[in-house]
Amino acid sequence: MQKIVTLILLTLSVFGTGFADEDNFKVKKSEAEWRKELTPEQYEVLRGQGTERPFTSQCLHIKENGEYHCAGCDNLLFTSGAKFKSGTGWPSFFEPRKGSVVIRTDTSHGMTRKEVLCADCGGHLGHVFSDGPGPTGLRYCINGVALEFQPEE
């Protein structure tokens, strides 16, 4: 029995545990509620840690000023002033709004990356890399389907 428990713990540490502990997030919904409120694509990314295909996001083409909110809970995540064209196929930002995201280690798919989660609902947004422009040198590579754009009034 002890060998089985050890094997399970080792597997979880190598492959990750899926979602962050949902007790840490303000917005709490059942999986049935998430499925009802999100489109299938949003659910796959935000709740299933999926990745949308590159160059498919409508957010790539938004040029106007405004704010990018979490599609799952409406948390303000990024502003258009922090958006830049990375050429990667996903909306990219050099910094989030303070306190709006949580970073955790993602060891899925045989690599180690820094996963970006919404600080309010724990939804998977994308990953952050250290190859971005100034002033931070960071590139928050975000799935556009996880975002809702609200134009500046």
Q: Which role fits each region the language model picked out?
A:
Residues 9-10, 42:
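Enrichment for repetitive, rod-forming helical segments
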Residues 10-18:
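Hydrophobic h-region of N-terminal signal peptides that target proteins for export
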Residues 19-31:
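Short, contiguous pre-domain boundary segments
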Residues 25-26, 35-37, 41-69, 75-153:
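A short Gly-Trp-Pro
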